[in-house]
């Protein structure tokens, strides 16, 4: 199908799901009154070291994640074309599910910070290996993309968990909202920048710069 039709169908399904939820799932009797967004909660990013660490770790992760997903079809396209390329790109992105599940299970043993750091470091290493892996044998190329696709997203819930755990109790909701919003703003900048640069540079030159996010994120998480 053309991508426009896919987007139309997915949008209609999302709309139908929202309407179904609104029509069939009422608010419970103990629903608290909605709190107002507290902009001053942003101050915790500078005054509260654990919040600053997890938030900036998340920002670094968001620099890489969505831009990688945007570039996956181009990366796969260096080896495959047509339907096989589409299927392979889907598989690489879908492997992130395993990273999230595995990370959630490991948290019980080693904690969210270690899981987040390990996955961010692994995906960052995959960025830096790009100039060599793009020309590697097919099996090595496939394993590289599989590892990258698995680890690039698995740290996301861990950073959110750490921010929620470390945030002041009275501002958890506001801080999560603001941190997520900033994170997606970082993604927009990253996507636009790399899309522009992709017209001038090849993937071997471009992909290592995705590691800027993981490197900065790990540096902020060091404390």
Tell me the role of every PLM-derived stretch.
Residues 1-11, 82-84, 193-214:
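A membrane-interface helix-boundary motif in multi-pass transporters
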Residues 12-31, 218-223:
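C-terminal membrane-cytosol helix-exit motif in multi-pass small-molecule transporters
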Residues 25-56:
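Juxtamembrane intracellular "pre-TM" segments in multi-pass secondary transporters
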Residues 50-101:
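Extracytoplasmic gate region of multi-pass secondary transporters
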Residues 59, 90, 94, 121, ...:
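Transmembrane alpha-helical cores of Major Facilitator Superfamily
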Residues 99-112, 198-199:
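Helix-to-loop junctions at the C-terminal end of transmembrane segments
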Residues 111-162:
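C-terminal transmembrane helical hairpin of 12-TM major facilitator-type secondary transporters
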Residues 164-201:
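A late C-terminal transmembrane helix in Major Facilitator Superfamily
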């Amino acid at each position: 199908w053309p991508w426009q039709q896919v987007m139309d169908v997915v949008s209609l399904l999302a709309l139908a799901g929202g309407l179904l939820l609104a029509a069939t799932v009422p608010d419970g009797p103990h629903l608290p009154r909605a709190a107002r967004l507290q902009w001053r909660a942003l101050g915790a990013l500078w005054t509260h070291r654990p919040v600053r660490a997890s938030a900036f770790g998340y920002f670094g992760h968001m620099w890489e994640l969505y831009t990688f997903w945007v570039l996956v079809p181009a990366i796969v396209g260096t080896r495959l074309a047509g339907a096989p390329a589409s299927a392979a790109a889907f598989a690489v992105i879908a492997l992130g599910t395993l990273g999230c599940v595995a990370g959630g299970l490991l948290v019980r043993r080693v904690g969210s910070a270690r899981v987040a750091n390990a996955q961010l470091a692994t995906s960052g290493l995959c960025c830096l290996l790009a100039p060599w892996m793009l020309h590697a044998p097919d099996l090595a190329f496939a394993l590289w993309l599989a590892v990258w696709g698995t680890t690039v997203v698995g740290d996301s819930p861990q950073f959110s968990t750490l921010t929620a755990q470390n945030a002041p109790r009275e501002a958890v909701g506001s801080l999560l909202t603001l941190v997520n919003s900033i994170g997606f703003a970082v993604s927009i900048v990253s996507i636009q920048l790399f899309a522009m640069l992709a017209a001038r540079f090849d993937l071997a030159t471009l992909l290592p710069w995705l590691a800027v996010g993981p490197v900065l994120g790990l540096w902020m998480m060091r404390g």
